[in-house]
Regions:
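Mid-domain Rossmann-like dinucleotide-binding core that forms the NAD(H)/NADP(H) cofactor-binding site
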Residues: 5-82
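Phosphate-coordination loops involved in phosphoryl transfer and adenosine-cofactor binding
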Residues: 29-32, 98, 121
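Short amphipathic alpha-helix with an adjacent loop that forms part of the alpha/beta core around
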Residues: 83-95
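N-terminal Rossmann-like NAD(P) cofactor-binding module of classical short-chain dehydrogenase/reductase
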Residues: 101-102
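Glycine-rich phosphate-binding loop and adjacent beta-alpha segment
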Residues: 108-169
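C-terminal hydrophobic helical "lid"/dimerization subdomain
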Residues: 112-116, 157-199
Length: 199
């Protein structure tokens, strides 16, 4: 559509996935949403939280990614190598922990944080669309003990129009998501380098 740059449009699927993921949580204004991973999808989900008047808390071990999240307006970020994640979330939420947690397996964050940061009876959404993930391990005893609701969202089906509308209205800021642009003629030369990069 007119008014949307190509470099923004390539994130339509991730925006649609984030919209669908937050919709699956049945949040209310002011709820806290812990997001495990400050990758592109995690930051987009956090931006949407702010738009929906939720309070995102982004958790990642990569300071560069956390800085990018902060540049996108995310106020609460936690680096587990620098702070006790559970204690910090207790401070942020006034002792009640996060009502909701989003976990994106490609973020390289461990799922074992989920029970310690999500309040009893809270909801966890495992989100993403990478079908080549290794097995994920989460202690179901902890999930049962806290009576957590677990759901999964693997695509943004049904939310593309919403995603396009959010881009057109500049709700989502994609600045910093693209490291470099490669010209078509340079693909053969650049492919070995970019195939080694982790995203």
């Amino acid at each position: 559509p007119e008014g949307i740059k190509d470099n923004d449009a390539i994130f339509t699927e991730q925006i649609a996935l984030a919209v669908k993921s937050l919709g699956a949580l049945e949040t209310e204004r002011g709820d806290y949403v812990a997001i495990l991973g400050a990758n592109t999808l995690g930051i987009i989900a956090a931006e949407l939280c702010i738009y929906y008047q939720l309070v995102p808390i982004v958790i990642d071990v990569d300071e560069t990614k956390l800085s990018l999240a902060e540049n996108h307006g995310i106020y609460y970020t936690i680096n587990p190598s620098k702070a006790d994640v559970r204690q910090r979330i207790i401070e942020i939420t006034g002792g009640k922990l996060a009502e909701f947690t989003l976990y994106e397996p490609r973020s390289n964050m461990l799922p074992n944080y989920i029970p310690s940061i999500t309040q009893e009876g809270g909801t966890v959404a495992v989100i993403g669309y990478n079908y080549f993930l290794s097995n994920l391990q989460l202690n179901l005893g902890d999930v049962l003990e806290k009576q957590l609701n677990v759901t999964a969202v693997k695509n943004g089906y049904g939310e593309f129009n919403t995603a396009i509308n959010l881009l057109a209205n500049k709700v989502i800021n994609t600045e910093g998501f693209i490291d470099s642009v490669i010209k078509f003629d340079d693909i053969d030369r650049e492919l070995p380098r970019i195939s080694e990069d982790k995203y």
